[in-house]
Design a protein with these regions (language model features):
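Cysteine-nucleophile active-site neighborhood
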Residues: 46, 50-51, 55-131
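Catalytic beta-strand/loop cores that center a nucleophilic Ser/Cys/Thr
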Residues: 120-161
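Active-site-proximal beta-strand elements of phosphoester/diester hydrolases
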Residues: 9-14, 124-125, 164-168
Length: 170
């Protein structure tokens, strides 16, 4: 790739993205196309992205049935998809899993999570009151990170398409 040209074209589906996410993607030589929450799967696919990123955002993920339906279509496209926070929850719902309201949400920059494959533990920043119900995941999805305080799902890897997501803010 010639110097100065972006390596990847990433569509950021914006549900309330933090500016630091955009800065980080730019620093990784990504050409970004930011699209609003109401964008259809067809419109996103017309942009011909190398990858799709689902941003963080507020609220109950189940309040977004139109987004969930469009995301289910994107998951069949075989384009890599990465979700953060609300994006993580929406991707789980789009693949048949369930989300539940937590008794005590995860708030702050001191939430320990464990990579279930490597055993590595990371201190993460989180701000959410809903979690993906691990027991509801389809066979094609595997929990990749868990919260060390309460054992809730903090990450998922999908085996039927190139998708992965995390509940925390990387």
């Amino acid at each position: 790739v010639p110097s100065g040209l972006p390596k990847y074209h990433v569509v950021l589906w914006d549900f309330g993205a933090k500016q630091n996410i955009l800065r980080k993607l730019h620093s990784l030589d990504c050409e970004l196309t930011v699209v609003p929450a109401g964008t259809s799967a067809e419109e996103i696919l017309k942009l011909n992205p190398d990858g799709i990123m689902l941003s963080n955002g507020p609220g109950d993920p189940k309040d977004n049935p139109e987004i969930i339906a469009e995301l289910a279509k994107l998951c069949q496209s075989q384009i890599p998809i990465f979700g953060i926070c609300l994006g993580h929850q929406l991707m789980a719902l789009a693949n048949g899993a369930n989300t539940i309201k937590m008794k005590y949400g995860h708030r702050g920059a001191n939430q320990p999570v464990k990579n279930v494959e490597t055993g590595s533990i990371y201190i993460t920043s989180q701000n959410h009151g809903y979690t993906v119900d691990s027991d509801s995941l389809p066979a094609s999805a595997k929990v990749s990170y868990i919260n060390m305080n309460d054992g809730t799902c903090e990450g998922i890897t999908y085996q039927n398409f190139p998708g992965f997501s995390v509940q925390f803010h990387p």
